[in-house]
């Protein structure tokens, strides 16, 4: 088997099936990543969504015996939405991050990886592979960086010269000894715009993220959102793009190369109030094909409530009151009560008191009390201004 020729053939085949960038690296242990992960774990900075076994995250040969190399791929996704609908005072909208526009990228990249695997295995019967995207054991970003796809920027995103950081990543471990590519140089320079712009200070240092403070992570949690973050997520329903949109290296980067990644504006920027009463079936039918649906409707509904509070949308108060009184989920009842207080209409004070009297869940009860205090504070402020 001529490995050099096979590499060139694989590169050409990858282009033909719509892979925007491909790179190669060894299957050696990711030693520097191991040190970083141990540090992040000790600081409590991990999200909890990662593979818990650090050795598996840094040792490809634990995942594929006799592994010799890793093939990394990247697909560029759009950064701008065509005909994006606007929020109005009576029809407020939320936003899904760009990585949740169009068809779930996990499915898109798995399809590409399957084709690449089949291509290689058609060349020789002894070829072995193991592929993964996002939810696999390896760090997609660490592999992509070492394979020369892009460099790891201060916002922790893999940034490519061609497409900026608007790329999806995946990789395939193989027993073929492909010649590794050369990593590219860091292009951040002295710029710190991403660190300065992060709404929650999650980027604690250049290249170091406290995932527990990252809005992208927080929008995916299912419990009560900590108080300090509630006013910072704005109208984000899933994910956050701030550290990407402020990056100078992303300026002018907007690629519409894959039709399946094009966003439906009514899904990527949905109306908020209809989300409050959406059924499981309706949610699955409308949002089930996008990556932002993977945690179910509860986090999206909670975030929609917080977004309505962010807008101080008084037109949503009847729906929020209905949730506070009747929703079976304490997180939704409590968050709705907090939002009612945040919106600040004194006419709803009695509804909050009624809810507090009958509420049995201690956490939800605490949120109702917060709503009452917010409403009182709002009334005092209005009196002071009058």
From Swiss-Prot:
GO biological process entries: queuosine biosynthetic process; tRNA modification
GO terms for MF: 4 iron, 4 sulfur cluster binding; epoxyqueuosine reductase activity; metal ion binding
Binding site for cob(II)alamin: 57, 97, 134, 139-141, 152, 155, 158, 169, 216, 240-241
HEAT-like PBS-type repeats: 333-357
Compartments it resides in: Cytoplasm
Catalytic residue positions: 134
Predominant place of localization: cytoplasm
Assembly and interaction partners: Monomer.
Protein name: Epoxyqueuosine reductase
Organism in which the protein naturally occurs: Bacillus subtilis (strain 168)
